[in-house]
Design a protein with these regions (language model features):
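Short, Lys/Arg-enriched N-terminal segments with co-localized hydrophobic residues
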Residues: 18, 23-36
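PLP-dependent enzyme catalytic core of the Aspartate aminotransferase-like
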Residues: 22, 38-39, 121, 162, ...
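Short conserved active-site loop signatures built around small residues
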Residues: 38-73, 264
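Conserved N-terminal alpha-helix of the aminotransferase class I/II PLP-enzyme fold
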Residues: 82-131, 156-163
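Conserved PLP-enzyme active-site core in the AAT-like
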Residues: 42-44, 60-61, 123-354, 361
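Conserved C-terminal alpha-helix-loop-beta "cap" of PLP-dependent enzymes
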Residues: 337, 345, 349-352, 356-447, ...
Length: 472
């Protein structure tokens, strides 16, 4: 069995703070410094998002080769200097890499960078967004426990909570995330988390993270937020009280539809010990010689336990190459997301005024005053490049429209630089029954769009040409 040393657990926490630390730590002012004209250190400079996405985790060139780009450390394992060194690694007295299933230097840079961008203390990259969601809930809930989740979440996460985890004794109650009384009433003594998405899937409805966090914390449980559709460039849920954030990195982080991966970010703010509901994080773990993750890893206890236990035993490890691709994606995240949003808002306006469209499901044109308020609060610069609209003519018209698009690709992914389209009821959400489809706001005439970064005139022309075929 491969074990993660206790001091390596602490190292995982400390490494995340070497460059910029948390947002609350930046800039750090040394009040003892008398010379006010002295050059600021990196930690004292209040670097913005666009700078963080390029530099966190690799502040200096590679120490071995002087390469400025992050190297791909394509290795399964690491050499020990001698038997004594190997024993020290396994014996919890020397920090460092042991085996590629647990840690890798390329992955480490990606984890530091996304943690900094989200404002967390630590992160863990894994093989897929589905693995990220699964690990989060497995780390929180065990047989006999319960999760409260919003109805308007990704279909894969819905199936995980509704069908897969119940086979292991973990149940879920799905609620309207805008009915706070319903959310409160769904919480039981054995509830271990509330889960929502920043932007609902697939209609991009905006949840009130701050309100839901206050409900969760009143019951001494964490708020878990899937921030895939928003990205930390538009919203940082931790700033509004979220405790755990995760992403399908396949989407905006990668951005080009080439690479599968996921990532979990630990805010470091939830007090697992004071809650009294999470003994596996607090009490001694027998597979690590009685280590308590809260005591050993401090604020990074949550993701450290996933790495040390779940990743060790179930192995949904991200590859170094995929971590490298995601680092490339992060370097242009702000630029791409700005263009995605700019294009999407113009498409929303176009569709909202089209005679063959019954309704556009996007918060910017919602007739719900609460949605308008939340959209302005959480997305002051706009957001929601993945959304749906309902076309006149039912399912037949929806499918004909999709089949006549040329620029849009018909596929199951979203958040690609290329514009994408799909008919959710017959594909991505086809495993849901009629009631579940209604809960998620999906009808037979619903079409989901993921607006890319092409020239906006070309995007709208493609939509216009497809609409013309319905009038023939």
């Amino acid at each position: 069995m491969i074990l993660l040393p206790c001091n390596q657990i602490g190292w995982l926490v400390n490494e995340n703070k070497k460059f910029f630390g948390n947002k609350s730590d930046v800039p750090i002012r040394d009040k003892r410094r008398k010379n006010t004209m002295a050059k600021k250190t990196r930690a004292e400079r209040n670097f913005k998002f666009e700078t963080l996405q390029l530099h966190v985790g690799q502040e200096q060139p590679d120490p071995v080769t002087d390469a400025r780009a992050v190297p791909i450390y394509q290795t399964s394992s690491y050499v020990f200097r001698n038997c004594e060194h190997a024993a020290a690694r396994f014996g919890l007295t020397d920090a460092g890499n042991i085996y590629g299933r647990l840690t890798n230097p390329t992955e480490d840079v990606f984890e530091k960078r996304i943690a900094a961008l989200e404002g967390g203390v630590a992160a863990l990259a894994v093989a897929s967004g589905a693995a990220a969601a699964t690990y989060v809930f497995q780390n929180l809930a065990h047989a006999g426990d319960h999760i409260v989740a919003a109805k308007n979440i990704y279909g894969g996460t819905y199936n995980l909570l509704a069908h897969t985890l119940p086979e292991y004794g973990v149940t879920a109650t799905f609620v309207d995330p805008f009915n706070y009384e319903e959310v409160e009433n769904a919480i039981q003594e054995n509830t271990k988390a509330i889960h929502v998405e920043t932007l609902g899937n697939p209609n991009s409805d905006v949840v009130d993270i701050e309100k839901l966090a206050s409900i969760a914390h009143a019951h001494k449980i964490p708020l878990v937020v899937d921030n895939t559709f928003a990205t930390p460039y538009l919203v940082r849920p931790i700033e509004y009280g979220a405790d755990i954030v995760f992403h399908s990195a396949t989407k905006f982080i990668g951005g080009h539809g080439t690479t599968i991966g996921g990532v979990i970010i630990d805010s470091g703010n939830f007090d697992w010990e004071a809650s009294g509901k999470f003994p596996s994080l607090v009490e001694p773990n027998p597979s690590y010689h009685g280590v308590s993750f809260v005591k050993a890893a401090g604020k990074a206890a949550f993701v450290t336990k996933i790495r040390a236990i779940l990743l060790r035993d179930t192995g949904a490890t991200i590859s170094p190459f995929h971590a490298f691709i995601f680092l490339q994606g992060l370097e242009t995240l702000s630029l791409r997301v700005e263009r995605h949003v700019q294009n999407a808002l113009k498409v929303v306006e176009y569709l909202n005024n089209h005679p063959l469209v019954e309704k556009v499901n996007h918060p910017s044109v919602s007739d719900d005053p609460e949605q308008q308020r939340l959209y302005k609060k959480y997305f002051p610069n706009g957001g929601g490049s993945i959304f749906t609209f309902e076309i006149k003519g039912g399912a037949e018209a929806a499918k004909k429209f999709i089949d006549n698009l040329e620029l849009f690709s018909l596929l199951a992914n979203v958040a690609d630089v290329k514009s994408l389209v799909i008919h959710p009821a017959s594909t991505t959400h086809s495993q849901l029954n009629d009631e579940e489809l209604a809960d998620q706001g999906i009808k037979q005439n619903t079409i989901r769009l993921s607006i890319g970064t092409e020239n906006i005139d070309d995007i709208i022309e493609d939509l216009d040409e497809a609409f013309k075929t319905l009038q023939e």
